[in-house]
Regions:
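A short, flexible helix-boundary coil/loop motif
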Residues: 134, 138, 165-173
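Short, charged, low-complexity patches
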Residues: 48-49, 150, 154
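Helix-centered, glycine/charged polyanion-binding patches within enzymatic domains
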Residues: 74-146, 150
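Generic, well-ordered alpha-helical scaffold segments in large soluble proteins
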Residues: 31, 55-62, 88, 127-130, ...
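Polybasic low-complexity intrinsically disordered regions
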Residues: 1-74, 82-84
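Structured core elements
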Residues: 2, 27-29, 38, 71, ...
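Short, polar/charged, Gly/Pro-enriched helix-capping and turn/loop motifs at alpha-helix termini
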Residues: 66, 99, 168-171
């Protein structure tokens, strides 16, 4: 793929305008007030469905509590992760199962709490877009995988400073 960056992978997006992109998979976790609490740049692309449970555990380690709600897109869904998340104490698991034929599951995915979780997830997609546009995550200017991790980390820190400043400004008015 790249002579200069041999760690680069092809990421199949399936979009009509850009079906393939090049880079690494970056996972972003966001909490209240649009603060990114964790990010990870993967050396090799794992299946999205294997990432959900570790995200809940990272949230618990960093913030000292299990999240009340977990929202993710359908790629993160697996029955095992959903059951394990609920066993850990997550009250609402808003992760759609697009392949379901169960009427019970379809009804669950139309409940208010599930839809609120998916709206939150849509907002998190906006955070990714902001990181790409405002903080230059479209293209990494540092060489190597460690350079990419550093580049993403600096973008996350910069965005968190902006979000904290906005939050404090709202509190003082």
């Amino acid at each position: 793929m790249s002579v200069f960056e041999p760690h680069t992978e092809i990421i199949r997006k399936g979009k009509g305008s850009k079906p393939n992109e090049f880079g690494k998979l970056v996972k972003i976790q966001e909490a209240e007030n649009q603060i990114v609490t964790h990010f990870e740049v993967f050396a090799e692309r794992p299946a999205d469905s294997t990432l959900l449970l570790s995200s809940i555990e990272v949230h618990q380690q960093r913030l000292g509590r299990i999240p009340r709600m977990v929202a993710a897109d359908g790629g993160f869904y697996s029955r095992e992760s959903e059951k394990a998340g609920q066993a850990l104490g997550v009250r609402w698991m808003s992760v759609p199962n697009k392949k379901t034929t169960s009427s019970e599951r379809k009804l669950r995915q139309h409940q208010g709490w599930f839809r609120r979780g998916q709206k939150w997830r849509t907002g998190s997609e906006g955070r990714i877009s902001v990181l790409k546009r405002r903080h230059g995550l479209r293209r990494c200017l540092y060489p190597g995988l460690d350079g990419m991790r550093r580049w993403v980390g600096l973008g996350v820190i910069a965005d968190n400073f902006i979000q904290m400043g906005c939050y404090l400004a709202r509190q003082s008015t």
